[in-house]
Swiss-Prot record:
Database matches in PROSITE patterns: SCORP_SHORT_TOXIN
Free-text note on domains in this protein's UniProt record: Has the structural arrangement of an alpha-helix connected to a beta-sheet by disulfide bonds (CSalpha/beta).
Localisation per UniProt entry: Secreted
Organism: Olivierus martensii (Manchurian scorpion)
Sorted UniProt keywords: Disulfide bond, Ion channel impairing toxin, Neurotoxin, Potassium channel impairing toxin, Pyrrolidone carboxylic acid, Secreted, Signal, Toxin
Modification type Pyrrolidone carboxylic acid: residues: 23
Name of this chain's protein: Potassium channel toxin alpha-KTx 15.8
Lineage: Eukaryota, Metazoa, Ecdysozoa, Arthropoda, Chelicerata
Positions bearing the site annotation: Aromatic residue of the functional dyad: 58
Family affiliation: Belongs to the short scorpion toxin superfamily. Potassium channel inhibitor family. Alpha-KTx 15 subfamily.
Function, in words: Blocker of A-type voltage-gated potassium channels of cerebellar granular cells. May also inhibit Kv4/KCND when coexpressed with DPP6 or DPP10. The occlusion of the outer entry of the K(+) conducting pore is partially reversible and affects both open and closed channels. It shares the same target in rat brain than BmTX3 (AC Q8I0L5) and AmmTX3 (AC P60208). Also shows a weak inhibition on Kv1.2/KCNA2 and Kv1.3/KCNA3 voltage-gated potassium channels.
Disulfide bonds: 30-50, 35-55, 39-57
Keyword Methyltransferase appears in the UniProt entry: no
Length: 60
């Protein structure tokens, strides 16, 4: 599975964080609604939504 460097860096920061949820903004464009399939493919979680035209995934 290919990860862009920004997503990989964000995942590293999220995994080291002691705080709750972490947001990962992808480069995938969207037009409202859920980004579950994108988030599942990009970071392995199904939690995500479209914010400002980009899919944002949430990792606990």
């Amino acid at each position: 599975m290919k990860f862009s460097s920004i997503i990989l860096l964000t995942l590293l920061i999220c995994s080291m964080s002691i705080f709750g949820n972490c947001q990962v903004q992808t480069n995938v464009k969207c037009q409202g609604g859920s980004c579950a399939s994108v988030c599942r493919r990009e970071i392995g979680v199904a939690a995500g939504k479209c914010i400002n035209g980009k899919c944002v995934c949430y990792r606990n």
